Amino acid sequence: MKTLWLTAFLFPLFFSAQTEEDLYTELKLNLPKTKNTAKEVRVEPDEIYLDKKMCFILNLNDADNEGEKKQTEYGLVPYSYEIKSLKGELLFFGVAKKDEAGNWKGIVDFNIIGKKAYRNPKVTGATRLMENLVANNVFNKDCSVNLDNLKQFYEKSNTIEKCRGDN
């Protein structure tokens, strides 16, 4: 009887184990939306698509594969990325590394608006950044950036109290 009770209790736990993907939820900031707002994003190894249109170049620097770390202004990191316009303009630069507990932490510079040191636990890398920006109506279908929404996104969701570059 104890075995049956234990099996009934553990069965749902075993088969409902959540992955990191299951635990992910987007930031919901209720930023204004227009008829031109992009609705979906797809991040590939070298490019980023909005509503199935290639809009951005993604440069990943994954030094961790070779056991190395890259020196950045945020210290030695195993992972950094750049998101650029198709014309090569740097829009975002981000780094990610694991903390002492093994959780990924990220910092992003919003170069397009001259802001540095953005951090939010829901933004740990390029994919999560883009998913959250699209979910908060920052990009338009024509690959342009809604700068007002981007500034609001930065101000409302940045968890770093005093951001460098903000005077």
Model regions and ranges:
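Bacterial Sec-dependent N-terminal signal peptides
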Residues: 1-23
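Cysteine-centric segments in proteins
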Residues: 19-167
